[in-house]
């Protein structure tokens, strides 16, 4: 398993996005770094300045900046990690981690019917169907 630092992860994950202008790709990488550093925050909380926040909203408002284009490089990296003809199993689970209603901690949000505080954890494990060996996802 390869664990990347936040800046390297953002560059590897989003550096190949084609958003109509290289400056947009650089902005997306910066925004991804900021979001990874504060995943529990809103866009204004995650960005380092009001200018960064406005730039993020301008980026999202561009016609060339689409969900499909943002995830395209990640999907290509995942496909490239598999040889043609290989069968992979991707086992995933979403778990609700609830700390109860009295727990006060940063980064927690409403869970259940809104009375609890916690977060959702979504994990995925890719296995080779032939030998059940764990594989790198993406």
Regions found by a protein language model. Name each.
Residues 1-138:
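Conserved, well-structured functional cores that handle cations and Mg-NTP chemistry
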């Amino acid at each position: 398993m390869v664990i990347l630092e936040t800046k390297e992860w953002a560059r590897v994950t989003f550096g190949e996005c084609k958003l109509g202008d290289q400056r947009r790709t650089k902005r997306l990488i910066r925004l991804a770094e900021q979001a990874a550093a504060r995943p529990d925050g809103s866009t204004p909380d995650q960005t380092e300045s009001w200018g960064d926040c406005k730039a993020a909203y301008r980026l999202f408002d561009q016609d060339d900046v689409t969900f499909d284009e943002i995830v395209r490089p990640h999907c290509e990296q995942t496909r490239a990690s598999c040889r043609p003809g290989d069968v992979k199993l991707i086992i995933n689970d979403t778990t609700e981690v609830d700390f109860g209603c009295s727990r006060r901690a940063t980064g927690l949000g409403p869970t259940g019917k809104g009375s609890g505080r916690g977060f959702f954890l979504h994990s995925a494990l890719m296995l080779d169907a032939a030998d059940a060996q764990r594989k790198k996802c993406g």
